[in-house]
Amino acid sequence: MALLPFFDLTNFESDASEELGWLKYVGRVQTRVFPQHFKDNLEKVRKISETIDVIVDTTAELGPEACVNLLNAGALAILVNEEMLNELADISPNRLVLKTDTTDIGKIEKLSQVAGSIQWIGSAENYPPDFFERASKIIHKAVMPEGGGRTLYLEFPEQPSMEVLKSFSVHSVVPVLSSSFLTVKPAEEPKKLSLADLILISANTDREDGLFSTLVVNELGIALGLVYSSKESVAESLKTGTGVYQSRKRGLWYKGASSGAVQHLIHIDVDCDEDCLRFVVYQTGKGFCHLDTLHCFGQASGLCQLEKTLIDRKNNAPEGSYTARLFSDPKLLRAKIMEEAEELCDATTKENVIWEMADLMYFAITRCVGSGVSLNDISRHLDLKHRKVTRRKGDAKVAWQEKLKDKGGVANTSYTA
């Protein structure tokens, strides 16, 4: 992660995609919640989390219950002070970021075992010259309990220079910067920091032409192809909100400009070794490849291909086709989903489970496509459910309890997912 933009919740109303604007291309923001507006702020965090990851500063006198509610609402992590860190000791370190101004290296080493990451506050000049180099070695020497690297953040209350930020990037310090400091149009706003320059601030390449290897994936994480990027192409991609790359022969390559297979940019990030960019995009048209396939490794398959086919059938299915009938007859579709779900439950062999699950997914995804719901929407929702730190008992509804009793089964057991 090259930077963490700070986004003021008072600027947010209802549409995360629109109101976050180009900030969503970073894939993650930080914000702050206050007790006097907690209910409203909680809903805003929930809404923004449907689109991008949010780290929430809870140090404005929020209690443990409010902190847990924010995590349940989908916050990727929360910033806490040392006192709250101790009260939330049962929460995974992956979800906790300690906010501090301590320079005690021994204390930092101890606290970093409880908080996955640490964010320092105040002016960088207030810290000893070699402090962040030493702190970085401690923070980064171990991975998180649930996987992933620990992060060292530094909050900048005033806009720093690129030279200052580069000096911190050497030690893998991630700057927390107000969104008002940033721009995707540096030529028009020369006093602000270029978002493209910040994303690439620690990226490296061993190519003589200085281009960065770039993996392009769709919203489901499926690799579409390998391309190259330059500072200019990244800047243009952020400015236009589309996939723009660097052709080694033709210069800037605006994907889809001639074919119509335009890519809508979701976000850009850099891999753990900082030598490969990843563009996450929504691919339109027939696909990414010049051979009119979704990706450069052949045809799409599995759920991705099923969704693509169903979307096409919804828009172009000939009258009388079975899929067209399903889209136009909600009672039939409902019956088929219930029928296949029951057959899946009754399946007794591995082969039967595979068969019935495939049937159920066909009808279930047809239902989703008919309602304008994508696999990516579902995937994101599953991620948010996984982030909950408190769980409901999960009993079946009464009607299904009775149905199971009729089959001689046991209706309810307590579990935690």
From Swiss-Prot:
Example of a GO biological process term: L-histidine biosynthetic process
Region (Phosphoribosyl-AMP cyclohydrolase): 225-299
Catalytic activity: 1-(5-phospho-beta-D-ribosyl)-5'-AMP + H2O = 1-(5-phospho-beta-D-ribosyl)-5-[(5-phospho-beta-D-ribosylamino)methylideneamino]imidazole-4-carboxamide; 1-(5-phospho-beta-D-ribosyl)-ATP + H2O = 1-(5-phospho-beta-D-ribosyl)-5'-AMP + diphosphate + H(+)
GO terms for cellular component: cytosol; nucleus
CDD domains documented for this protein: NTP-PPase_His4
Region named Phosphoribosyl-ATP pyrophosphohydrolase: 303-387
Organism of origin: Schizosaccharomyces pombe (strain 972 / ATCC 24843) (Fission yeast)
Keywords from the named record: Amino-acid biosynthesis, ATP-binding, Cytoplasm, Histidine biosynthesis, Hydrolase, Multifunctional enzyme, Nucleotide-binding
EC numbers, comma separated: 3.5.4.19, 3.6.1.31
Gene responsible for this protein: his7
Subcellular location: Cytoplasm
Gene Ontology MF, one: phosphoribosyl-AMP cyclohydrolase activity
Pathway annotation: Amino-acid biosynthesis; L-histidine biosynthesis; L-histidine from 5-phospho-alpha-D-ribose 1-diphosphate: step 2/9; Amino-acid biosynthesis; L-histidine biosynthesis; L-histidine from 5-phospho-alpha-D-ribose 1-diphosphate: step 3/9
Record-given protein name: Histidine biosynthesis bifunctional protein his7
